[in-house]
């Protein structure tokens, strides 16, 4: 794995996590 792959994976994980928090927040959980 190179640095670009690791960076891209980290960005996708962070984006998915933040998106999940927004969805859960709007759902009132």
From Swiss-Prot:
<comment type="function">
    <text>Component of the cytochrome b6-f complex, which mediates electron transfer between photosystem II (PSII) and photosystem I (PSI), cyclic electron flow around PSI, and state transitions.</text>
</comment>
<dbReference type="Pfam" id="PF03742">
    <property type="entry name" value="PetN"/>
</dbReference>
<dbReference type="GO" id="GO:0009512">
    <property type="term" value="C:cytochrome b6f complex"/>
</dbReference>
<feature type="transmembrane region" description="Helical">
    <location>
        <begin position="3"/>
        <end position="23"/>
    </location>
</feature>
<keyword id="KW-0934">Plastid</keyword>
<protein>
    <recommendedName>
        <fullName>Cytochrome b6-f complex subunit 8</fullName>
    </recommendedName>
</protein>
<keyword id="KW-0150">Chloroplast</keyword>
<keyword id="KW-0472">Membrane</keyword>
<keyword id="KW-0812">Transmembrane</keyword>
<keyword id="KW-0602">Photosynthesis</keyword>
<dbReference type="GO" id="GO:0017004">
    <property type="term" value="P:cytochrome complex assembly"/>
</dbReference>
<comment type="similarity">
    <text>Belongs to the PetN family.</text>
</comment>
<keyword id="KW-0793">Thylakoid</keyword>
<comment type="subunit">
    <text>The 4 large subunits of the cytochrome b6-f complex are cytochrome b6, subunit IV (17 kDa polypeptide, PetD), cytochrome f and the Rieske protein, while the 4 small subunits are PetG, PetL, PetM and PetN. The complex functions as a dimer.</text>
</comment>
<keyword id="KW-0249">Electron transport</keyword>
<dbReference type="GO" id="GO:0009535">
    <property type="term" value="C:chloroplast thylakoid membrane"/>
</dbReference>
<keyword id="KW-0813">Transport</keyword>
<keyword id="KW-1133">Transmembrane helix</keyword>
<dbReference type="GO" id="GO:0015979">
    <property type="term" value="P:photosynthesis"/>
</dbReference>
<dbReference type="InterPro" id="IPR036143">
    <property type="entry name" value="Cytochr_b6-f_cplx_su8_sf"/>
</dbReference>
<dbReference type="InterPro" id="IPR005497">
    <property type="entry name" value="Cytochrome_b6-f_cplx_su8"/>
</dbReference>
<dbReference type="GO" id="GO:0045158">
    <property type="term" value="F:electron transporter, transferring electrons within cytochrome b6/f complex of photosystem II activity"/>
</dbReference>
